[in-house]
């Protein structure tokens, strides 16, 4: 079986996020798994690290690639990143879910289309979604 090299990579910087949301690796881990499942991705494993005195990193390894967050609570900043291979899983859905959970004051986003030759950079359409409670 031959697989397509096509992939989509969404990167988002969020600013103005509540300190407590960004400083809780277990909360972020739970929401990252929800985000991955919301876009139809298959979660293979999850690594979460709570830093001292603050900050967290969560990496979700997907069958389709990865979803990650790196936080700087003292700055109200989080870097979100989701890359998926193939056509079936849309990384934008996972990113939209997480942005809806974090409720940032500002977001800056780019979407890369990869695996088709030269990288294509496009402006993603950000949508707020109803996060699970």
Curated annotation (Swiss-Prot):
GO terms for biological process: spermidine biosynthetic process. GO terms for molecular function: adenosylmethionine decarboxylase activity. The active site is at residues 65, 70, 85. The modification Pyruvic acid (Ser) is found at residue 65. Disulfide bonds: none annotated. Binds 1 pyruvoyl group covalently per subunit. Its cofactor is pyruvate. One of its GO terms (cellular component) is cytosol. It holds the Pfam family AdoMet_dc. It catalyses: S-adenosyl-L-methionine + H(+) = S-adenosyl 3-(methylsulfanyl)propylamine + CO2. Pathway: Amine and polyamine biosynthesis; S-adenosylmethioninamine biosynthesis; S-adenosylmethioninamine from S-adenosyl-L-methionine: step 1/1. The record marks 64-65 as: Cleavage (non-hydrolytic). Heterotetramer of two alpha and two beta chains arranged as a dimer of alpha/beta heterodimers. Catalyzes the decarboxylation of S-adenosylmethionine to S-adenosylmethioninamine (dcAdoMet), the propylamine donor required for the synthesis of the polyamines spermine and spermidine from the diamine putrescine. This is S-adenosylmethionine decarboxylase proenzyme. The gene is speH.
